[in-house]
Design a protein with these regions (language model features):
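Short beta-strand
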Residues: 35-37, 324-329, 361-362
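Accessory recognition modules or surfaces
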Residues: 281-286, 308, 333-353, 376-377
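Conserved core of the PLP fold type I
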Residues: 64-207, 219-234, 380, 386
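Conserved core segment of the aminotransferase class I/II
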Residues: 236-308, 391
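Conserved glycine-rich beta-strand-loop-beta hairpin in the small C-terminal domain of fold type I
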Residues: 288-295, 307-319, 325-337, 367
Length: 396
């Protein structure tokens, strides 16, 4: 028999994955071209050709004992150094390989970070709406999320005042996801500065260390003049969890890292802890081929303009029909107000028109729904009549 801890997780499967599986069933009946699947954040822009070429060359030329052998749990030194130098060139920092630990994607990065700082009963602050897998990660270590309510009137910016009110001596971290999944909001420098100043005051008041865990898989996916602040510039005790899944369209390859800035408290021991957690959690090390490829390709990006066009067209199309949407500044999600209180029921209405979406309640954001527009542009265009038929029932 499976454990009591796992049973509710097994049978309460992710709404995102559930809708994705529903989409496959509909596609088998109506044809995939007649199903408009906006459920899963699965990049559909191909990885850059240069990355593919790097992988092929590595397979042909690299010493097979190095390519397929064990390595440091923190990863290859040359990959860690290449990432540090890329960050230095972008943010004017002075990181080295010693500040970087390679991981099997952002989920792994989050887990080894939490394993390193959390004790049973500790609290971690999250800003709703948020990626609900955080709850599962926290439960792995006996810790609990403390949820800050969403504020549509501010564009879903973090509520610093409520955050301060909910910080206790048990608070170990605050999770920031910027650009945000599911809203597409980008938290600007002034918001990060306010949040950082508040946390500095709370650290001093309580005599504790409170980390910012900055979950940044969408960092490179920003539009127009939007910029993602480098949080260590504002707050020393920042831990950056990064993934190449979105920036290089590599979600299946599971490659990312944790950055531990040298100004954070006890950073050297923290890096050792992350490396040890990689081993303890059975990850051991990030995939070898992907590490070596990333070392050659840190400056590459996938086609952000493609996502920007999809987001703009979807936003304009739905707002013209009467829907209220948050205009995305980053990531590849459109956050839309449900015309009825029951967002799950409304998503079922959309499904009847063969449009697959994710209810906002799956992100602790009831009354909204999320559309993931990492789809073909034809899917965006061809879905408009289906959206329109539903909109006419509510907006005339």
């Amino acid at each position: 028999m499976i454990s009591n801890l796992m049973r509710p997780r097994v049978h309460g499967s992710s709404a995102i994955r559930r809708m994705f599986e529903e989409g496959k069933k509909l596609a088998s009946v109506y044809g995939p071209e007649n199903v408009y699947d906006f459920s899963l954040g699965n990049p559909n822009v191909p990885a850059p050709d240069e990355l593919r070429d790097a992988m092929i060359d590595i397979l042909k030329t690299e010493d097979p004992l190095k390519l397929h052998g064990y390595m440091s749990n923190a990863g290859f030194d040359e990959t860690r150094q290449a990432i540090a130098e890329d960050l230095n060139s972008r943010f004017g920092t002075s990181y080295s390989a010693a500040n970087v630990v390679m991981t099997a994607g952002a989920a792994s990065a989050m887990n080894i970070t939490m394993r390193s700082i959390l004790e049973p009963g500790d609290e971690v602050i999250v800003f709703a709406p948020y990626f609900l897998e955080y709850n599962n990660y926290l439960s792995n270590y006996g810790s609990v999320p403390v949820v800050i309510a969403p504020h549509p009137e501010s564009g879903f910016m973090p509520d610093v005042q409520e955050m301060c009110a909910k910080i206790t001596p048990k608070t170990k971290a605050v999770i920031i996801n910027n650009p945000n999944n599911p809203t597409g909001a980008v938290y600007p420098a002034e918001v990060i500065s306010q949040l950082a100043d508040a946390l500095k005051s709370k650290q001093e008041e309580l005599g504790t260390v409170i980390y910012i865990i900055s979950d940044e898989p969408y960092r490179e996916l920003v539009y127009g003049d939007a910029k993602v602040p480098h949080i260590p510039d504002f707050y020393n005790n920042t831990l950056i969890c990064y993934s190449y899944s979105k920036s290089l369209s590599l979600p299946g390859e599971r490659i990312g890292y944790v950055l531990v800035p040298p100004q954070s408290d006890g950073w050297e021991e923290f890096v050792l802890s992350l490396s040890t957690a990689n081993r303890m959690l059975g990850i051991v090390n990030a995939p070898s081929l992907q590490q070596l490829a990333i070392a050659r390709c840190t400056g590459l990006r996938s086609n952000v303009a493609f996502y920007e066009r999809n987001g703009a067209d979807l936003y304009e199309g739905l707002t013209a029909m009467g829907f209220s949407c948050v205009k995305p500044d980053g990531a590849f999600y459109l956050w839309v107000k449900s015309p009825i209180d029951d967002d799950a029921a409304f998503c079922d209405e959309l499904k009847d028109e063969r449009v697959l979406s994710t209810p906002g309640s799956a992100f602790m954001g009831p009354g909204y729904f999320r559309l993931s527009y990492c789809v073909s542009h034809e899917t965006v265009v061809n879905s408009m009549p289906s959206f329109r038929r539903v909109a006419e029932r509510y907006f005339g």
